[in-house]
Amino acid sequence: MIFLIFSILFLHLANCDYTPDWESLDNRPLPSWYDDSKFGIFCHWGLYSVPAFRSEWMWWYWKGTQPDKDVVNFVDKNYKPGTTYADFAKDFTAEYFNANQFAETVKTSGARYFVFTSKHHEGFTMWPSRTSWNWNSMDIGPKRDIVGELRDAFKKTDVHFGLYFSQFEWFHPMFLDDGKFNTTFYPEQVSYPQMIDIVTKYNPEVVWSDGEWDKSDDYWKAKEFLAWLYNSSPVKDQVVVNDRWGTGTMGKHGGFMTYSDHYDPGKLLEKKWENCMTLDKHSWGNRRDMKASEVNTAYEIIEQLARTIACNGNLLLNVGPNMHGQIPAIFEDRLEEIGRFVNITSEAIFGTRPWIHQNDTSASNVWYTSKYSSGKKPLKNLYQNVYNFQLEEHTIVYAWILDTSHEQFELKSVKTTKNTTATILGTDVVLTGFEESDSMIILSSKIDWKKLPRRDIIVLKIEKAASYLRNPLMSTNEHHVQ
């Protein structure tokens, strides 16, 4: 079986557009749907949701090279002597799991894509993997194809479906032996066939690799996999991937960059990137002792979304369901609150590009996004796909004012003309009467605060601001366009 898989792959690679080397693979254009989508929901769910203690790394903290005393004590106190991690599987019932409800919750959040953990570092697969016998959601625990049910549910929506996949497994005997004997049995017989399996069975539009850092991209056969994915897979035209494909690849190779978890550069990056973060500030997986104060507020997430998309990133926000298959109510409440505002301000988010400024040069906590009114690029240059120029007749600027406590807001990055207007999204309020000026001033007294969808965030749609050129990637110099 393994020989057949590799034979098919090498036959495909013989006549293909992309070859298994980074020079070729890194030249593949990123499908536009991903950049346009801006906001996604991540979901970490696996066997670790049964003990639900510390984080999804619980097994490693319990039985790894340096056991955590608190985790060891937790198991000793709450489980019978001799308990193993595999014993948790019988309690992983998922009896309340409803894939359609998951899809509806994601849809309510306003997110445009969804990424689910098909397998985390524990090795338990959430689909019936042939290379993970009796250690998958069909053979034990829920006895359901969780990935398949989610794929079918998201097919009914316009939300893109993606899969996270951990390359390594902490305690898999083959992986441990490979480290001892410099062999490659684990990728050849386990992880590589699993990647092919999830793509061919479930057609994910995102393949989100992780757990790669301990071995090289050659060990994981990452380049061979990506060449097949881009050339011959059933999702070759629309799939996107991240940058975690082996030691030293993060931030260098792949589709979009992640650089690290919770990455927030605060400046424009030329390469498309993603900020993956959690609603629970301390864990990706479900945590039984999580406190309400440890959950990010809707404001904090919206603020992070604005900062991220202003700098050419996407935001991937994680939730962790419990062992019964329920997304915690506090997470659902947060997603609903976020979704209300995202849907009201959607034109300032989806399909936008960074502007010539990412945040304001003077006003505190103001971030910018932009788009062209015609939907077409009126000027072309090397960075036309990274940011939009400021052209009075073409550019719409969205100013995300994230600190509304001032009596006036002076936006020094926006130069006004007599034709400039500013609409407060979510209201029918249009501010006019601007003069030719090197900054835009909005008086708090001119705002009908009762009409705002939120009083702690204002999003302005600015049209016909004065033209001027600035390359935010190369210099701070600017000049007016006549």
Swiss-Prot record:
The record marks C276 as: May be important for catalysis. Keywords: Glycoprotein, Glycosidase, Hydrolase, Signal. One of its GO terms (cellular component) is lysosome. GO terms for molecular function: alpha-L-fucosidase activity. It comes from Caenorhabditis elegans. It catalyses: an alpha-L-fucoside + H2O = L-fucose + an alcohol. InterPro entries: FUC_metazoa-typ, Glyco_hydro_29, Glyco_hydro_29_CS, Glycoside_hydrolase_SF. Glycans are attached at N182, N343, N359, N419. GO terms for biological process: fucose metabolic process; glycoside catabolic process. SMART domains: Alpha_L_fucos. It is an enzyme of class 3 (hydrolase). Its EC number is 3.2.1.51. Pfam families: Alpha_L_fucos. The lineage of its organism: Eukaryota, Metazoa, Ecdysozoa, Nematoda, Chromadorea. Alpha-L-fucosidase is responsible for hydrolyzing the alpha-1,6-linked fucose joined to the reducing-end N-acetylglucosamine of the carbohydrate moieties of glycoproteins. Residues 1-16 form the signal peptide. It comes from the Eukaryota. This is Putative alpha-L-fucosidase. Belongs to the glycosyl hydrolase 29 family.
